[in-house]
């Protein structure tokens, strides 16, 4: 008994000496792990240093033996299979993480029988498994599975090929695209394809052998890979080919990637060396970024025959191209090099339908092309047609973010032809346009380009609505523009419209600017009347402490003179205590001290 206990202690000490060797990483066999069984040339084998399977099994099984694990055979309904496609570093069959006596390799099995750990086991072994547990005198033989990696690869390849054929049967137009691979000139199409290697032959966690999926290694040890990949995850999910751009293809991505490669087919224009090669395809080139630039280079050569050929192919689509992100640039270039007859055809084409020119002018791309038409129009007939097409939607055009630029270009290039209908629209819809973000800009342009009676009527209409416009975020700019025209009659009319409301107007954001402009540009008589109204109205203290009103008082101090200035200073001093405790009041006191 003592001798037996001594032997067990010796074996336990031996086991303690064995365990550090298993986990230290020093005694690992040097063997490569292949990321894929594919025949692709881009597959790289990376050396992995893994612990020997036999070392793990022997050490931990013996630990179970000596630490009181019950001597019985766990029940398992599954027979033992050894997958020949994967071997451990020592070329022994893989041993699974679950301790099952019927999953032990033959050497370990006999060793456990010798120490009495597996008594009477022969009755639980099936006849098919007895070949793995032979007596010592007979050599071991491995069960060789009839299924090889090549069979698995071929099966996966055929399944993926069938999916592709089904997809192509639903989308027959892709068959033509595939045939382009055999054409000498292959720059017609550019689409992303899966690598030419058989990526469908990679290890898949769903289709692979169930026994292979159960194999596991300590992830911490597997992280010692020389690659920048988590090797444990690569083994678990299957690894694939590393493509030319460095992307790692995994098996569970292949079907999706193939579908994406078919769906992402994108038609690219053919590259042409001369305009003759592009005959019949000008319309499509005009709508492509590179094709449009190619055609513009042809225009730069100013060859009449080439211009005529391009013109004839796009004239029927001219309105569409004018609103195209790339085509509009070609139309602009065409208008610079075409002759008068061709330009007239373009004008007729874009005005043949009512409202078509308005639609193009309001388009973010079309507005540039229409402006170019306005700039290049020379004949009175052309100008008349353009004006007739624009006049019915002029108010909408003026208020549009893109269309207002066309109207401004008309004022710049088509006067006096367009003056009448433009100024009439401005006068009739003065308040509507003046209070619009874009309309106020066009109205100021109209004031700048108008002359004589037209200008007088327009200014008078604006001045008569001065009180309303002064309080509008956009109308106040139109009113200030009228002040800057320095028309005395217009200034007096505006001052009369605002009189009696200066205190209220001074404490509003928009109208306070108008009051400052009045103090600056009014004559001494009207300036004095404004200041007296501010003092005598009884709310000067509120105006001085107001975020906007304090600027009006500062302007009054700066522009006033004589008795009016003295009255204003005295009124300010009466509120000096409240001004000192208010940030806006301090600004008034600062202006008062600087005036001295």
From Swiss-Prot:
Molecular function terms, GO-annotated: RNA binding
Biological-process GO terms, alphabetical: regulation of translation
Keywords tagged on the record: Cytoplasm, Nucleus, Repeat, RNA-binding, Translation regulation
Keyword RNA-binding: yes
UniProt-listed InterPro entries: ARM-like, ARM-type_fold, PUM-HD, Pumilio_RNA-bd, Pumilio_RNA-bd_rpt
Pumilio repeats: 277-312, 313-348, 349-388, 389-424, 425-460, 461-496, 497-532, 533-570
Protein's cellular compartments: Cytoplasm; Nucleus
Nucleus keyword on record: yes
GO cellular component, one term: nucleus
Domain PUM-HD: 254-596
Comment block on domains: The pumilio repeats mediate the association with RNA by packing together to form a right-handed superhelix that approximates a half donut. The number as well as the specific sequence of the repeats determine the specificity for target mRNAs.
Role: Sequence-specific RNA-binding protein that regulates translation and mRNA stability by binding the 3'-UTR of target mRNAs.
Protein name (record): Pumilio homolog 12
Record organism: Arabidopsis thaliana (Mouse-ear cress)
Gene (UniProt): APUM12
